[in-house]
Amino acid sequence: MMSKGPAVGIDLGTTFSCVGVFQHGKVEIIANDQGNRTTPSYVAFTDTERLIGDAAKNQVAMNPTNTVFDAKRLIGRRFDDRAVQDDIKHWAFKVINAGGKPKIEVEYRGETKCFSAEEISSMVLLKMKETAEAYLGKKVSDTVISVPAYFNDSQRQATKDAGTISGLNVLRIINEPTAAAIAYGLDKKVERERNVLIFDLGGGTFDVSILSIEDGIFEVKSTAGDTHLGGEDFDSRLVNHFVEEFKRKHKGKDLTTNKRAVRRLRTACERAKRTLSSSAQANIEIDSLLEGIDFYTSITRARFEELCSDLFRSTLDPVEKALRDAKLDKGAVHEIVLVGGSTRIPKVQKLLQDFFNGRELNKSINPDEAVAYGAAVQAAILTGDKSEAVQDLLLLDVAPLSLGLETAGGVMTALIKRNTTIPTKQTQTFTTYSDNQPGVLIQVYEGERAMKRDNNLLGKFELSGIPPGPRGVPQIEVTFDIDANGILNVSAVDKSTGKQNKITITRDKGRLSKEEIERMVNDAEKFKQEDEKQRDRVAAKNGLESYAFSMKSTVEDEKVKEKIGESDRRRIMEKCEETVKWLDGNQQAEKEEYEHRQKELESVCNPIIAKMYQEAGGVGGIPGGIPGGGMPGGTPGGGIPAGMAGGMSGDPSSGGRGPTIEEVD
């Protein structure tokens, strides 16, 4: 039995993975059994065995349908995600729909097997674990695994699950750019604050993070990215280009009908792409590619840049967004650090350099190993390493997307805003929407838009057994708690009974596609006006409804009945009932209509209530509004609803007739 070894850091990449360990005061990146410091994230199944890493990638042309890679592009996503559907076109292995989740179907030892992306990733992690154990001569269980900073909740949870499946104890999920920043900043004694932009373009994902580094404190200011952009996409552009060229040269023969031919072409394209980072031209020579035809061709760097120009240019959008969110202009960034193999592409470097007005880019860290390096440092810190190098290191990371829940009117009320430092915990009190409501449905969303329908539903749960009471009286305390992995726990407690329910948002929901994330965040700017208009409309509607109910309950109060004439009381009741009836039939009216109706209602109610006060001589004792917040409170000692107190009109986080809950200040 091997003794227990130190904790390791693993960079689980889309195309390559890497493992490092911090010992004797420094990080060592560990080479695998082939002597390579990075291992392909490939798993192959044959009639006799399972191969992982180099061995799997080396036989891919002979066995394309049973060699699985790019699992990171499936992890935590739904089958019908557009990105997944686009990717399936490029893969030789079969992806099937298993209850909305993508599963990979392969032939293994003469049987058909299905694997989830988590299982495939766990096999790659297992290879990294064994690589570390062979080097250390000890058993490895504790690890820190990296994920793209822009990975959402489902993807983080799924990655953690993959670690668990492979028999690892996942101490922490760390964001890749943050890990790379540690690799950049660990040995630098930064006395005064420096703003560092990490530009991390890998095989399948792209992240930009801005950190301030000072005295061993690494604080993430903002993060942005695209979980579906990387070297694989550049390879695909080359493959498509040569498939067309082959058709032209050989009487319309279509390579895509032969999976092995496409795989051989893809391998050649990846090699050519790498060559083009240092040469102006690359040659492709593949013998007997299809039906005995040899394919000899070449491609220039200029042509490659043209084929990928839109993809290369799109890397600047997250840079702009990260700067905006961090409230920094270009000049305030001290260092631009390149991470990820795809940052070796000269055009990508040139675009970034031009964006920063010709500033020199920082290439001081190894782009393939930096993330594993940082993860290894974090693993050492979490296991209490006393080494001087990591003694005073502090990491402050952020949540990439806003998190909240649905409140009345389909509005998303954010409890945690994007780029909030994690871990974090936010609690807010909500109340019921209708009288004697027995339970509330708590629906948790992630995204930047005002209305829940434009955001991503992460999960939902019911809090039942609320004692019967008028609307607005029960108080339900909802807590959002994001741990240091960026994974969300939500709990709800009914304050009167102490009844509690909680949910860890797990991966039952897939995740947003690149299109959706872009639509949510970038378009949020364009949609802002619409969002605000909708919020105001819902707030006006809630305001009117609340005012009507409040007035009704005020004049039904025994103490008020004594002080008000029956005819006046009936007038108020009838007008309130008429208003509520109108509201039921006009859920989608404009803000102005609701405001007009409220003025009408006030013109009936206010004189009567004011007269009652004068007669009562302003003496107290007339109830004010309904207890429990979210309802109008009265003037001192009186029953005139004062505006719409407690999360009502003008409060963007209140909403219209929602299914369940409404906000309380």
From Swiss-Prot:
Keywords: ATP-binding, Nucleotide-binding, Stress response. SUPFAM superfamilies: Actin-like ATPase domain, Heat shock protein 70kD (HSP70), C-terminal subdomain, Heat shock protein 70kD (HSP70), peptide-binding domain. The keyword ATP-binding applies. Residues 629-658 have a biased composition (Gly residues). It comes from the Eukaryota. Residues 629-665 are annotated as: Disordered. InterPro entries: ATPase_NBD (IPR043129), Heat_shock_70_CS (IPR018181), HSP70_C_sf (IPR029048), HSP70_peptide-bd_sf (IPR029047), Hsp_70_fam (IPR013126). The keyword GTP-binding does not apply. Pfam families: HSP70 (PF00012). GO terms for molecular function: ATP binding; ATP-dependent protein folding chaperone. PROSITE patterns: HSP70_1, HSP70_2, HSP70_3. Belongs to the heat shock protein 70 family. This is Heat shock cognate 70 kDa protein. It comes from Echinococcus granulosus. The lineage of its organism: Eukaryota, Metazoa, Spiralia, Lophotrochozoa, Platyhelminthes. The gene is HSP70.
